[in-house]
Amino acid sequence: MCYSLSIQSSIDFHNRNALKIHGDRAILTSNLPTLRRIPFLPERDRRRKLVLCTGRVVNSLKFTGNTSVDLCGIPRHRLRVSCSDARRTPEETAAELTAQPNFSEFITSERVKVVAMLALALALCNADRVVMSVAIVPLSLSRGWSKSFSGIVQSSFLWGYLISPIAGGTLVDRYGGKVVMAWGVALWSLATFLTPWAADSSLWALLAARAMVGVAEGVALPCMNNMVARWFPPTERSRAVGIAMAGFQLGNVVGLMLSPILMSQGGIYGPFVIFGLSGFLWLLVWLSATSSAPDRHPQITKSELEYIKQKKQISTMENKRISTSGIPPFGRLLSKMPTWAVIVANSMHSWGFFVILSWMPIYFNSVYHVNLKQAAWFSAVPWSMMAFTGYIAGFWSDLLIRRGTSITLTRKIMQSIGFIGPGIALIGLTTAKQPLVASAWLSLAVGLKSFSHLGFLINLQEIAPEYSGVLHGMCLTAGTLAAIVGTVGAGFFVELLGSFQGFILLTAILYLLSALFYNIYATGERVDFDTTA
């Protein structure tokens, strides 16, 4: 069915209920296919009939949502709406499937509000992690801890992080991201808030508090992955992940930059109290303003909901809450090489991430002999770069897919940049003689690392959408084991060789090997997990 909007000299409605005037707008309403808002009618088109078919591009305008036509000075009596039964062409159908909302529509949509809240949660997640990376310097000095023992204290977070991702991913797949994320933020904020009292009680209480932070934060990324898969169509998921992970990296910046300031004002435990309370403020907004899926969101517009469903070609499984209590098919998941591609990539990502996050303040303090505030600043700059490049990578990834690049090739391009780039940059870091140069190399490494989020991280949703939560949990568990080895191993490695350089070179080589493995075995297509390899 095609609908024509003409500018006439008199009122002439074939379908009188199809056009309603509201202020300076004419709105097509009656039994129309979903059409997109036309922001204006150019002067040259005011005397030209515009045929509006769903998704069809006419005069470089795309129509997908409820149509609202600004009158732009056109007299109301010169508007006419008529309809015909013209058959839609394949080209029109294809155009409908590729029509994209403009930037203002995208940025004000409910799905972007949801991903913005996810970004804030991930920012708090990393801020609560990184506090100990700064606090460990004065703690180790005041209590006489060696570098190897400092590594063990920092790894206590990872021991907790090790046990929760698979269980958390399974819970996310069953109950949805809203509920599980709420519990996660509540628990890790409480544990962070109580850390000062735990530290004053005993070493074991401190280790237990940090382990509890790790347990609770293990659900954060599976929740993000699950909600992005439900709220965003494939052509927007890269940008959504880019926004969420930008918050993730900005949490590092906020934690590293604010912690020394808060320590100078409120003592060594000041940041733990402030960041812990911030989590509870976030929780109030999250519970009142979000839903696990778009079809359960009370404020989403009909046009946005239809757009999401149409672009996703949503299945029954994606539309309804997964209520089965069955055990996920771990054997079948592990029988496929694409699963191992994302597991290996996530393991290397976690190794590099936690080594840099945990050891860079100590690295700058001990190698370049800068004070704590300067060490925190040099360590924070790279994460600012990662937040910026992450969104650029997401935009570029979506653009490649919209222009016809296969999802598989797009993921491999992003992953290659995200691992080969840091590998080369870390080799450069070993040659730096000044802290400013070292921070520049580190910024390049961490900035390029963000491209891998548009490789392996989003790839989880594509190869196993029905198991994305549990698969992400499996990857995080493997990654946490790698992070424990890297974080603890770095301390022993430095004590054994007396230098950070050898460990940085080892990390660079592992990045390059992981990129090769991913390019050989990864795919962007859905994998059949109903049969074993």
UniProtKB/Swiss-Prot annotation:
Q: What induces or represses this gene? A: Expressed with a circadian rhythm showing a peak during the middle of the day (under long day conditions).
Gene3D superfamilies from the entry? MFS general substrate transporter like domains (1.20.1250.20)
What residue ranges are annotated as transmembrane? 117-137, 152-172, 179-199, 203-223, 243-263, 267-287, 342-362, 376-396, 417-437, 438-458, 474-494, 502-522
The topology of this chain with respect to the membrane is: Multi-pass membrane protein
A GO MF annotation of the entry reads: phosphate transmembrane transporter activity
Task: Name the protein family.
Answer: Belongs to the major facilitator superfamily. Sodium/anion cotransporter (TC 2.A.1.14) family.
Q: What is this protein called?
A: Probable anion transporter 4, chloroplastic
Q: Which organism is it from?
A: Arabidopsis thaliana (Mouse-ear cress)
Gene behind the chain: ANTR4
